[in-house]
Amino acid sequence: MQVRLGTIIHAVAISALLLFGAAPALAGKTQNIVLIVSDGLRWQEIFTGADPTLLNEKEGGSWLAEGELRRRYWRPDADARRALLFPFLWGTVAKQGQIFGNQTKGSVARVTNGMAFSYPGYNEMSVGFPDPRINSNEFGPNPNVTVFEWLNKFDEFHGRVAIYGTWDVYDNIFNKARSGLAMQTGWTLPHKAHETPRDALLRELYETTTRFDEEDVSNSLLQVALLDYVKDEHPRVLFVGYGETDNWGHQGRYDLVLDSAHRFDHFVRQLWDTMQAMPQYHGTTTFIITTDHGRGSGLTEWKEHGVDEKGSENIWIGVLGPDTAPLGERTHVAPVTQAQIAATVAAFVGKDYSHEVPKAAPPVAGVLNIPRE
């Protein structure tokens, strides 16, 4: 009787685990995950390249001669234009991974926070659900625990989760005071206990560079600090946020939006190549690449975003790594949302975030290809 009762209890326990999803996620090849964001970079540029109506001074605010701007970024064919603007995204990510969000081909990616600006977007992607309380970029410390803070509680990731971003508000979005995550944000001077001449030069550049504004450091300065950190500290979970595409959009400088977008693509390639050249990252690292919100699509609306600018809810998501099937540009698929990013980040490193946080959206379907045993 005792043996039979024990067997029954064991069977019930196993059934409960399967029913409620408490079993651990299946492990794939990914051991390191990187979420990369280019702030306010529209899906239109991602999928069709430079907008011909904005390649001028009148509508695009360009200071660069129109002929030179067209030489750099214009081609008659949309596929050629987008590859010219984003050579890594279309030459590597699209060939070896997947990209969602081309609405002209039946792929919709969108935010669900109803606000379509930065803090609500970063909260949604990092915690897995929108929070109506967060209705301003000046909201203050995030009351929600992000997937990055959550992963940092696991022994295998503790102390190896980092936030690198150009915007100083990331300190609040990822709640630096509570989470204790390693962060390099805004114009905060990079600091190392044992400073090399290279480190001293970088600090000097931070101190002497003329600031675009007091909140956002230049993408290029952050990139140097980021690459050094990756080489020295070997983080396993990493967030990287680049801000210039949004900054120049608000300034109405479409020429510099394109320059920043092109350099963003270069920075992502540079980070990928750097990590793939390191044994601890080679063949075991996944990149998720996206934006926090879209923008308007008219001759003046492209400069702004938010509830009053139609289309600002539309985003794009790219995934590249050893567990992602090379399906390329996704077409005629179910819509995906910004809220799904948090659980997707966790799933790639074998953690079931949606089970732990029931409000969180599930992982993006089809990007994690792990054979079941």
PLM regions: where:
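Bacterial N-terminal signal peptides
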Residues: H10-G21
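Structural recognition of the beta-strand scaffold that forms the well-ordered cores
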Residues: I33-V37, Q44-E45, F100-Q103, E124-S126, ...
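Metal-dependent active-site segment of extracytoplasmic phospho-/sulfohydrolases and closely related
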Residues: V34-L35, W43, F264-K303, V345
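Short, structured active-site-proximal loop/turn typified by the sulfatase FGly-forming signature C/S-X-P-X-R
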Residues: Q44, T48-M115
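Histidine-centered active-site microenvironments of extracellular/periplasmic hydrolases
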Residues: E57, T290-L320
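Acidic, His- and aromatic-enriched active-site or binding-groove loops in soluble protein domains
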Residues: V127-G140, S179-S218, L222, R263
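Non-catalytic, well-ordered alpha-helical segments in soluble enzyme domains
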Residues: F154-D155, D323, H332-A365, N369
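Active-site His/acidic residue clusters
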Residues: K176-R178, V224-Q270
